[in-house]
Amino acid sequence: MADKYNVFDQLGELENTLNTTLTQISGIRQVLESSMTENATLRMELEKLRDRLAEFEKKEVKKETPKDQPNPNLIQIFNEGFHVCHLHYAERLAEGESCLDCLELLYR
């Protein structure tokens, strides 16, 4: 008979242990759900930030590439009558002369 009471005691202890374990598992599940939700939110935010960064980089590249306009300093020197080409740099142009090398350098 003592064995039967011992079995009931052990069964009661097992039930208490299982309830404690179930409570711990429930807490872990809540933490995991919260972490997964936060992770998904952060991933979406990261994707948006990457898209914005790509837009800014495209705009930055566009700002750096306006090579349509020649260097204003070189234009001023050329208009004052001096060569700006590598071959004859700073030599005076003859009256009415235009140098193809200078023009190519200015307007490429």
UniProtKB/Swiss-Prot annotation:
UniProt subcellular location: Cytoplasm, Nucleoid
Keywords, in A-Z order: Cytoplasm, DNA replication, DNA replication inhibitor, Metal-binding, Zinc
Cofactor: Zn(2+)
Entry's Gene Ontology BP terms: DNA replication
Domain of life: Bacteria
Cystine bridges: none
Gene Ontology cellular component annotations, sorted alphabetically: nucleoid
Keyword Zinc among UniProt keywords: yes
Function: Involved in control of chromosome replication initiation. Inhibits the cooperative binding of DnaA to the oriC region, thus negatively regulating initiation of chromosome replication. Inhibits the ability of DnaA-ATP to form a helix on DNA; does not disassemble preformed DnaA-DNA helices. Decreases the residence time of DnaA on the chromosome at its binding sites (oriC, replication forks and promoter-binding sites). Tethers DnaA to the replication machinery via the DNA polymerase beta sliding clamp subunit (dnaN).
Subunit structure: Homotetramer. Interacts with both DnaA and DnaN, acting as a bridge between these two proteins.
Family: Belongs to the YabA family.
Name of the molecule in the record: Replication initiation control protein YabA
